């Protein structure tokens, strides 16, 4: 769905754009499929100490209960609505299954209201259907991919995300993820066929600082603009450089390019090529 730009009538509408909701996208969720969220002290731990900076505030939200497992095998479901979800960049779909259950799922690109979806090993190769990786042909575009069997999809869930099945060997499937990483996953794990919808989400221009504050994101102050007591980059007369060979975090650790992944993780053997 296209990005909608504002006419420049006030300073806050200059260079501002939002996701263009058309007549298909609804804003009001089904009450039984939502739950409240406790957001007291965003970015704080149990003692009230800031552990994640630049977070706080934001508009009140209801959490939509998304079915990432898609484990209703051989029970067809009909797409009833396409809805906005404030908790993620992708849109969501409300599905009515033949057995009477109602669920939310991620909206696959190209799926329309009235379409039918199916899960299971014998489901057809069609956008929105869920199958084990072993039953998919090579080159299939997929999203909402399981890492652990039965745990539900954990990879490629953002708006526009898509991975590719590039090989199958020794009961493992090789995937190329949206980040460029190539890794192995058990071929018994399931995934949804197709790409996540709302592919133009990254083209949105916030236009003003308040639009970020609505999302619960606070402004970030540069370390070089601080005092020496607050940041290793701080201090100096006027506009001075950081005074170091390489930039560091407020706590003195290397930043901007330093690999932060822990060594000797159990999943290292599954990663064939690091992300780009």
Swiss-Prot record:
GO terms for biological process: mitochondrial translation. InterPro entries: NA-bd_OB-fold, Rib_uL2_dom2, Ribosomal_uL2, Ribosomal_uL2_bac/org-type, Ribosomal_uL2_C, Ribosomal_uL2_dom3, Ribosomal_uL2_RNA-bd_dom, Translation_prot_SH3-like_sf. The keyword Plastid applies. Keywords: Chloroplast, Plastid, Ribonucleoprotein, Ribosomal protein. It is found in: Plastid, Chloroplast. Residues 225-276 are annotated as: Disordered. One of its GO terms (molecular function) is structural constituent of ribosome. SMART domains: Ribosomal_L2, Ribosomal_L2_C. Its main location: plastid. The keyword Ribonucleoprotein applies. It comes from the Eukaryota. Part of the 50S ribosomal subunit. Belongs to the universal ribosomal protein uL2 family. This is Large ribosomal subunit protein uL2c. It comes from Pinus koraiensis (Korean pine).
